[in-house]
Curated annotation (Swiss-Prot):
Keyword Phosphoprotein: no
Gene3D superfamilies for the chain: Photosystem II protein D1-like
Protein's job: The reaction center is a membrane-bound complex that mediates the initial photochemical event in the electron transfer process of photosynthesis.
Binding site for Fe cation: H191, H231
A Pfam family: Photo_RC
The keyword Membrane appears for this protein: yes
Keywords (A to Z) from UniProt: Bacteriochlorophyll, Cell inner membrane, Cell membrane, Chlorophyll, Chromophore, Electron transport, Herbicide resistance, Iron, Magnesium, Membrane, Metal-binding, Photosynthesis, Reaction center, Transmembrane, Transmembrane helix, Transport
Phylogenetic lineage: Bacteria, Pseudomonadati, Pseudomonadota, Betaproteobacteria, Burkholderiales
Species for this entry: Rubrivivax gelatinosus
UniProt name for this protein: Reaction center protein L chain
InterPro entries assigned: Photo_II_D1/D2_sf (IPR036854), Photo_RC_L (IPR005871), Photo_RC_L/M (IPR000484), Photo_RC_L/M_CS (IPR055265)
Residues that bind (7R,8Z)-bacteriochlorophyll b: H154, H174
Single GO biological process annotation from the record: response to herbicide
Length: 279
């Protein structure tokens, strides 16, 4: 891919966290860096192990391939390779690849003199994953509480965990996470739609300005958060969705073992209406 006219002046030495100038180069438009190498290493190794694990299983059906975590009897120990050890190694590779990618983003930000909003945002996605496969299993005392790597098996795991706590959607943190996910979708789709509508006027008319965009939302909902504000809001909504997703699963089991509908007993016992019988 050809280098864009303005890119050359930004391709300067320095800003690396590890490795100095050893990996401080580009391949086409992609910056490599030490953490680019480690990202590639962990990604290739993890993918190869998944393929090898699938070859040892009963099927090549993409929907049914599954790399399962260790049995609960192994606790937090190292399991035999074909009894969950493979899952443990793949998990290490996944975390290594994700963290390496985030650190590579940090190096790119340092080179460009930018702040670290992008790697910080990506770290919230890493947090959600690590919560599922490391933090919650450790708090519950066994790697077997992690989710399997497979399409149908992962969906089964989600369903089973939900039924363990009766109605999982009564989990207050889950409610917040879903609310933030849907609100992120709404806010970003409205923002994208607004930009495209302003940038694509009728033939022969000039492209509209930020004043048109602000006025649209003032006319529509009475307030415009502004061009910079919508990006701040979008970042906040997206990070909140990832954060509360991590919270909703980590409190289920380690800190709350009963059905989630029971958690709402405090609401029914409020003195405002607890004096009246429910029936």
């Amino acid at each position: 891919m050809a280098m864009l006219s303005f890119e050359k002046k930004y391709r300067v030495r320095g800003g690396t966290l590890v490795g100095g100038d050893l990996f401080d180069f580009w391949v086409g438009p992609f910056y490599v860096g030490f953490f680019g190498v480690t990202t590639l290493f962990f990604s290739v190794l993890g993918t190869a192990l998944i393929i090898w694990g699938a070859s040892q299983g009963p099927t090549w059906n993409l929907w049914q391939i599954s790399i399962a975590p260790p049995d609960l009897k192994y606790g937090l120990g190292v399991a035999p390779l074909m009894e969950g050890g493979l899952w443990q190694i793949i998990t290490v590779c996944a975390i290594g690849a994700f963290v390496s990618w985030a650190l590579r983003e940090v190096e790119i930000c340092r080179k460009l003199g930018m702040q670290y909003h992008v790697p910080i945002a990506f770290s919230f996605a890493i947090l959600a994953y690590v919560t599922l496969v490391v933090i919650r299993p450790i708090l519950m005392g066994a790697w077997g509480h992690g989710f399997p790597y497979g399409i149908f098996s992962h969906l089964d795991w989600v369903s089973n965990v939900g039924y363990q706590y009766l109605h999982f959607h009564y989990n207050p943190a889950h409610m917040l996470a879903i609310t933030f996910f849907f609100t992120t979708t709404l806010a970003m789709s409205m923002h994208g739609g607004l930009i495209l509508s302003a940038a694509n006027p009728k033939k022969g008319e000039p492209m509209k300005t930020t004043d048109h965009e602000d006025t649209f939302f003032r006319d529509a909902v009475g307030y415009s958060i502004g061009s910079l504000g919508i990006h701040r809001l979008g970042l906040f909504l997206a990070l909140s969705a990832a954060f509360w997703s991590a919270v909703c699963i980590v409190i289920s089991g380690p800190f709350w073992t009963r059905g989630w509908p029971e958690w709402w007993g405090w609401w029914l016992n409020l003195p405002i209406w607890s004096q009246w019988p429910l029936n």
